[in-house]
Amino acid sequence: MKLKTKIHLYTSISLLILLILVHTAVYLIFSSALTSKDAARLADETDNIAEALRAAETEGVALQDMLQAYLPANGMVRVVNGDQKAVMTITKEKAYKDFPLSFHSGETADVRKPDGKLFAEAAVPVIWTDGQVVSLQLVERLENTEESLFLLKIILIAASAAVCIASFFAGSLLARRIINPIRRLMITMKDIQRDKEFKTISLEGQSNDELYQMGLTFNEMAMMLKEHYDKQQQFVQDASHELKTPLTIIESYSSLMKRWGAKKPEVLEESIEAIHSEAVHMKKLTNQLLALAKSHQGLEVDLKTIDLIKAARAVMQTLQSVYQRDILLETDKESLLVKADEERIKQLLTILLDNAIKYSEKPIEMSAGTRNGRPFLSVRDEGIGIPEEHIPHLFERFYRADEARNRKTGGTGLGLSIAKQIADEHGIELSVKSKPGQGTAVTMQFSEQNGGGR
C-alpha cells in the first residue's frame, strides 16, 4: 500500500470513528434529555389526576367521566389493583389495552419502547372507591419525541457524510502535500543513481516545516557528498600524477642502466642515484598519503595537557641534528600548557619547520607565548616567500606555488594539507603571512580556553 493511500485511509477512518463517537454521544444525551422531560411532564399530569380523583369522591362526580377528561390525545389512563388486574381502562386506541400491565406501589415515571415505539408511563398510588390502594397509570405515545429524535439522527448522519466527503478531499490534498516533496526527493535520488551526478531539489514556495527541513538536509548532504566526491576524484588524479613522474624517471633510468650500465660506470652510478632518490620521494609521498587518509577517518585525538614549548624544543633539536641547521626559539615563558595530542602536535611542528628549512638558507626563528589570552607558536623563515595569490591555496592537497622549486626540494604538496588537518582536529587556527623575497611566517593560534603558562 502506498504511503499516500495509508495517510488518506488513516485520516478518513480516524475522523469517521471520531464522528461516530461524538454523534452517538450527542444523540444519546439529547434523547435522554427529551425522554426525561416527557416522563416528568407525564408524572405531573398523573399527580393532577390523583388530586382530581380525591376531589371527585367528595363531589360525587363519576370517576370514568373524570378520567376521560384527562385522557391524552394519543394515550391511555388505567387503574391497576394489587392483584395485577385492570380495574378501569380508558383509551381511544384498542392497541393500548395490550400495553404491559403492572402494579406500582409508589410513584414512578419511566419511558418504555415496546415493539420499537416510544411510550412514557407514569404511575401514582391512590385509594379507590372500595378502599383498596390501586395504581393510577397514565401512558402516552411520544410521537413528537420520536420525530425529533429521527430528525436529529438524519441531521447527524448527513453531517457525518458531509464531513467525511470533505475530509476525503482534504485528506487527498494533505496526502499530496506530504507526498510530493518525498516524491521529488525519490526522483532526485534516482536521477543521481542513474546519471552519477549529484543534484539538489527545489525548495521554493515551501513553508519551514519538517518536510522543508528534510529537503534542506538532503541538499546539504548532496552538496557535501559532491564536495567529497570531487575532492576524492581530484585526489586520485593528483596522486596518479605525482606517482607518474617518479615512475617515469625510474623506468627511464632502469632502461638506461639496461642499455649502458654494464659498459659505462658513470651511467650506472647516475641511474642508481636517480632511482634511489625517486624511491625515497615515492616512499615519502606514500607515507604522507597514508597519514592524510588516516586523518580523514575521524580517529580519536588523545587530548592531554602538554607543554607546547617543551614539544617545540624536542622537534627543534631533532631537525637541527638531521639538517645541520640553526633553529632559534624566542619566548618569555618557561612553559606553555595546552590540551593537545602531543604526537600530532609534534608532527604539525615538524611539517612547518621542514618547510621553512627547505625554502630558506638562513636560521629559522620560532616564537611562542600568548596573545589576548590565547597560546600561539610561530615559525618564521627568511626565504624566498610566497606570492599573495597563492596563500589561500597553500593547505590544498598537492598545491605548489612553484612546481619546479618544489620538485627540487623533494616536496610532495601534502605536508601543509596534513598540517591543516591536524590543526582542525585541535581547533587550532593556522595563519600565513608572506612576501616574496622577505620570507614566510606560519602561526599556530590555540583557543582561548586552551592555554596556560608561566
Curated annotation (Swiss-Prot):
Phosphohistidine: modified positions: 241
Enzyme Commission code: 2.7.13.3
Database matches in Gene3D superfamilies: 1.10.287.130, 6.10.340.10, Histidine kinase-like ATPase, C-terminal domain
Cysteines joined through disulfide linkages: none
Cytoplasmic-side positions: 1-12, 175-454
Membrane-spanning ranges: 13-33, 154-174
GO biological process: phosphorelay signal transduction system
Spans within the Extracellular topological domain: 34-153
GO cellular component, one term: plasma membrane
A Pfam family this chain is assigned to: HATPase_c
UniProt subcellular location: Cell membrane
Keyword terms of this UniProt record: ATP-binding, Cell membrane, Kinase, Membrane, Nucleotide-binding, Phosphoprotein, Transferase, Transmembrane, Transmembrane helix, Two-component regulatory system
Name by which UniProt lists this protein: Sensor histidine kinase YkoH
